[in-house]
Each structure stands twice: as C-alpha cells, then as structure tokens.
Amino acid sequence: ANVVCSLGLESPAILLSSLQLDAFRRGERLVTESHKRGIRGAYFLSTSLELAPHGARAWQIIADIDLAQGQVVERIRLFRDPGRAGQVIAHSVDAGRDELARIVGAADGFQSTAEEAVTAHHYANVLFNILRGGIFDDGYRVSATDFASSVRHCNKRVYERHQELLAALEESLTIGQLLSSVQQGGDPQLERLCYEYLPITFGRRHGDPSRPWNKFAIRLKDESGERLLSYEGNWRDIFQNWEALAFSYPGFIEYVVAKFVNASTVDGYNPYRITRQGIDWEVEEPGNAWSHIGYWGDHQIIYLLKLLELSRQFHPARLSALLRSPLYSYANVPYRIRSFAAIVADPKRTVDYDRALEARIADRVALMGADGRLVLDAGGNVYQVSLLEKLLVPLLAKLGNFVVDGGIWLNTQRPEWNDANNALVGHGVSMVTLYYMRRYLHFLQDLLATDTGPIELSAEVAEWLADTSAALADLRPALGHGPVSAEQRWRSTEALGLAASRYRDAVYREQPFSRQVSTPLEQVTGLLEGALAAIDHSIRSNRRETGVYNAYNLLDLGPGELRVDPLYLMLEGQVAALSSGAIEPEAAAALVEALFDSTIYRADQRSFMLYPDRPLPGFLDKNRVPAASVESIALLRRMTEAGDRRIVSRDVDGCFRFSADFTNVDDLDARLYALREAYGDEIEASRAPLRTLYEQVFRHREFTGRSGSMFGFEGLGCIYWHMVSKLLLAIQENFFAALDRNADSETCRRLGGLYYRVREGLGFNKTPAEYGAFPTDPYSHTPGHAGAQQPGMTGQVKEEVLSRFGELGLRIAGGALRFDPRLLRECEFTSQPRQFQFLDADRQWQELTVPASGLAFTWCQVPIVYRLHDGPPGLTIVSKDAGTRQLPGLALPAGLSDEIFRRSGQVRRISVDFPRALLHL
C-alpha cells in the first residue's frame, strides 16, 4: 500500500480526490475527505496562511510507497508524533542526499570549473550512467560471502568442490586478492566464475518501458532485508555503461570483458539480456504477433573492442597473458540459425527456436545452477576455451555474412543499433559494422604482433577459420580495382556463407565441440590480413564524392549475382567511419565539415538528425499502378477485362491500385496460388513481372522501418542525442590521433574546433526554451515538432563521460597516465580561488582549495588540480607514505599510475601546472 501524509500545517482540509477542485477555484470552503472509492485518488491540502513581512512558513507532503501492512502500521504510529516524524524525515533526506552524493563521487562525478553548466552536465551524465549500469559496491573490495553465494548460484558442483577454499577467505578482501586465492585452487571453472564476478549495485533497468525487460527497479536489499548486489539489462546497453564505469575502475576491466565474452554463443552472438543471475533470451510464442526472436549483432564488435582497448591501455600485458587461458565459456541459447541456402531463399526468416534444447537447458539449470545455460563438455562441466577463440568467433560470424562492397548482411532477424531501421532486416547490409570490424582487426593484429607459437582452438572453430581464410584468399585478386562484379560478389558471399553454415551444422549438436586442436598462429594472422584487405576495399567503395560514407546498402540478389545499392545519408555511418581508423586526419575534418553542410544538419538545434527529413506521400498518393503496366501484364489485362478485382482494381478516377488485402509480396503470391484454377498457365507466366511491378509500386526494399514513417524516437526530423555524442567522441579520437601522428597544426586546429562546434549543439549549452527540457540533463531524442524527450534513458551518458575526461586530457597508454590538455579551453579555468569537495578513495569527504586560474576534478577518486602558470609543465604528487614530490613534464611513471588505477590510497592528490600555450585556442 501507499501512505501519504503532511507535516507543518495546522488542521488543513485534506482532499483524497479532485472532485472539489472547481469549488476551490470558485473560492468556496473545502470539506476534508476521509474516504473515497471507485475514482482516481489524489492528495491535496487546503488552508489559509497569514505571513508577516519577510516571514516564511514551510510544510511537507510525504509519500511512502509499496509498503507491507506492518510497515503501514509503523508509519501511522510515527506520524502521530509530528515533531519526531519531522526529525526522522529530515535525517532520512540528509542521509539519502549524502549516500547519493557518495555514489556519484565514487564514480568521479564531481568537478569544479568556471563553467558550471559543464560540471552540472557531467554530474548528470555520471548519475544516469550509474542508474543504467550500476556501480561497484565498495571500490575494489568484495565480500567473500557474496562471492560464495554467486558461485553456488552459478554452479553447485564447483561450489561443493571448493567449500573449504571459499570458507577460508577473509570476509572483506580486494578483487585481486580474491583472484589470487582462487587461482591457488587450481580449478579453471572456479577461476572463470571469479572473472565473471561483478559486485555491482544500484543499477536498474533502463529504456523504453514497453519492452519486457524494463521494469525500473533499483533493488538494494534481498527478501531478508540484507544488502543486495544486483544488476540486469539489455546487453547492448549495460556494457556501454560499464565501459564508462570501468574507466574509473580499471581494475575491473578484464572482469567485464569476461562477462561479455562468456555470454556469447557458439554461432557468435550475444543473447539479449544479462543479469547477475546469468543470461536470458527471448522465447518464441506461437500466435503472439509481438513475440520475436533473433540476434542483434551490430555493435557487438565495437562494444567488446572498446573494453579490450581499455585493457591494453591500462594493463598492456594482461590480455596477452589471457589469450591462451581456457577460462571462457559459450552461452547455449536455443536459437538455430538456418543454412546459407535457406537464408538466401528467405533472409527475413532465418532463426528457429529449439524447444527441445530449451527443455534440456531448463533441466540442467535445475540440476547445476545458472551455468546450465552454458555449453557443457562430455563430462557435464562448462566447456571452456581461450580468450583468443572467443574473440575470433564473433569476427568469423560477421565475416560469414560479409558482402564485398556492401557490408555485413543483416540476416539474424534483428536490426542494428537503430531499432527504427528494423525493416532493413533481410535485405540490408551494414557498412556500420564493417567500419568497426576494421578497427577490431587492427587491434587483434597489434595484440598478436609479438605472439608466437601455435594456439589451441576447438576443432570446429579451426576448420571455420581455415574455410573463411580460403574464401577471402579467393577474393583477394579482385580487390583494389573498384567495385567487384556482381558475379564475383555472389561467389565470395556464397563461399563465406557456406563456411559459416557448415560450422553451424557441426556445432548445433548435443555436444557441439569434438576436441581442441593445435593451430598455427599464422592461420589467425592470415585471416586478419585477408579480412582487412577486403574491408579496406569495401570502405573505399562506400566513400561518396562529398567525402561522407554510406551507412547501409540494399541487397539485390539474382541468380548467380549480387548487387548492392546505397541508402541515403545517415549520421550513424559517419560516426562509424570516423571510428574505423581508415580516415586520415585531414579527411576526417573534411567529413565533419561536410556534415554541417548536409541535409542531416538541423540549424534550429545546431545539431544532427539521424538521417535527412523528407516529406511523406499522402495516403492517396500511394499504391498507384501505372495503366501501361497493367496493360503489359497478360494476367492483369485479362482480370481487368473480366472485372476481377482480386489483384488490382480501378478507382472512380481511373487509377489502378493493388488489392488493399495485400500487406507484402507474400500475400500477392498467396493470391496468385488461389487463382490457379481460374487462370491456369497465365499465373506462372505473369508471376515474375507482377512481383517486379509490386516492388516498383511499393518499393518495400527501400523501406527502413519506423525511421522512414514516424516522427518521434528515431523517426524523421529527429535528433538522437546518443548518436550525436558518439560523433563527439569520434571527433575527439581523431583529434588525439592527429596529434599522435604529428599532423599539421591547421588540421589539428580544425578538428578541435569541430569538436566544440558539435558539442555546442548539446543541451547543456541551450536555454530551457531552446532545448525543451532541463538543459543539463541528458535526454534521449528531440523530434522535429517538440522539445527533448525521455530524460536519462540514453547511451549518450556513457559517451559524454568518456569525452569529458578526454577534454580534461586524461590519456592512458602502456599502463601509464599522462595529461594532455590540448583540447581543454581557457574558459574552464576559474578567475578566483574556490573550494572543491570530493570523496576520496577511503570514502571520506575531503575539501581542497582550487587556485585562481585553476580547475579540479577526481579520477579513480584521486583529486587532480590543474593550474595555468608561466613556467614549464610539471606535476606535484602528494603521497600517503612518500610525502610530496615534483616531476617535470605531464607524464606519470607506470608505478605511480598503477597506484591510481588500483585506488590504493597512496596517491592523495596531483597538481598539474602548465602554460596557457598548451590549451586549445
């Protein structure tokens, strides 16, 4: 039940409904309502006050919701004593405010600069990032009891084998100490569970409430009232938030990587939901039109890659050490992707639901725990493979759908990042994914550059790798001379698709993998080289004359040939292209400049739509069949003469139209089948031209989904702020890449200026009237006809948390931190000294003075103070044990950097002094 009451007013009239509001408007006396039923409830207070000059009166309306009966009785007793109740509420509000501030402070949400809107916006971004993805409960400290509970939930056998080890753990220990103790046990199964363990709290599901997984609940206590560690969310979103969180908690990066790859399937995809309890997937419900299954594979590569890149930056040797370690699992999702031939025959219906497998999985979960949803070996244990295998399988899955000059074929029944493009499924190919794959390939090449010796792979994966490499080798001679022929494109698509299809046939068994085999590393590096050549060729083919890039193309499948046609300009494609690493700094600047002159720029918001706005045809302008086309098809000519309106009919104005019963070409085929007796051989003779005419009239192939027919969310005229913030971060990456490559100063200046021009369009730079909402809060989207919509429900927060730390110049490479303020502006530095309150690594509130010409922020909960001065750049490090020391330049040694990464508390403060000349002008 819900309890509502008030404090601070003497004998007010209390209304439990809105029935007396008109009487109030007429100035009539209101009568207290003690009970109402059958109508919508409310709670209003009415009284008269007399205030002396400069006087004040305060009162409160308090609501407490979802209470059990015993709790209601407690509240009633409390509010019988208004004085005590007021004290309890004031204490609760203060405690809640402090606890929320501690949560945000622990994720580095507090900053102090001369631009208050910037720091307030950063606070909001950090807060919403936590609300979506959660936060680590106690820094790097974990509870042995909670870890043991997690092991027991996941795998009862492993828990029983290691009860003695688990019982011997100290109750509170660091995640590093926990891993070390687990490794001493010598059981890879337990080590896998340790790497998957994420002590996260406070996060709640997010997003569109119409989706079944979004039930907006922050669960902080269990049924017994004990503190609860929990998280859940759509995998496409929660891993984004964990990326930004891991930047402040780098010690957990490899654990997040493990959680990601351990949830991917044998066929290379991730099920739609991830929770502390394990993985989850959509279940097919026959007869339910809203039930749907399939895989989103679009940003799987880039989300994983961003985590891998963080690991290499912070811990340069750690991934290499894990590459060969058999600590990673496969999710066992009861989806079965059809054969290549079946996909070609109907690319929109490609995934079957295996109910027999679903039942077996349920039995295994009941027997062993959540690990029953993973692939098991012949002995009933979780089948574990190396990290390298887990990194190769999603790449091979994408290459199995690679269309040269086109992108990655969207044939797993789900769209890409933009759900509004859902109609692209089946006949769309994604350059977006291909741009990100290029970056992924380069990363793997760098990761393996110093590795030698053979690797262990599952035999079926090794064969898939070899078949894919052979298909890419056959394609190689056709590359580099402009787009390949339609026939060559089909041959390569078929070869790659059949390789993936044979692999799926092999692993869609009760026991998917037969054995592990030793594979020369050269086979892997050869695959990467061949794939990169084909992808670079395709990227060149998709650059437009204006310097922008295609995002998606459309497939046109014919007998023995495959053609691709580009769709219209999309912001998503430009962001992915900028992120690919394929564009030189000067070309990157030209691309962004072209966007400001393009049809996706909205001058009223100083920002970018997802795609160009365009007028839609009216109802009567649709479904118009040219009379000449009707006359040219014998069947239509005969049916029209006979007055048979079952395929086309003529309206009173003489316009021919297809039957209103038809939803798509399948309905046309069904009608033709039904007409066989009446029209005989004319049916088959007219089928192909009729189908062609139907597509010419409706152009269904070009229909992208609600993106081309709606106006809110990701519709026409809409700005989607997450994609704008992705653009911002991509420009920042190109800015720093230009500096690292020693690009000319003019190009660097252009990129920096373009960064701030894009940033200027974000809400926190606008008035409430211009933005249509609270400017400092992140919002999902701004349609063309309204202000910003859906507060906080956006991946924008993750991008902007990272881009903000980039603005401040935090750059990590080779396990060391350096400060690079060349994107920071002088307007952020204060003119007068001010106080800055922050939460330190020991969870204590501290305060420091920010000097004039300074600013302050925290990172890994270490306070960092910047100060502009006329001398050379230098650092002042205040340490817990070593006192104060000064270092020339702006780079920290790896040892000191590691103290910060580990949140050891040794580094208490860093002061960074540098001249104005280093700032962005």
Where are these regions (language model features)?
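Acidic, mature catalytic/reactive cores of soluble proteins
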Residues: 1-921
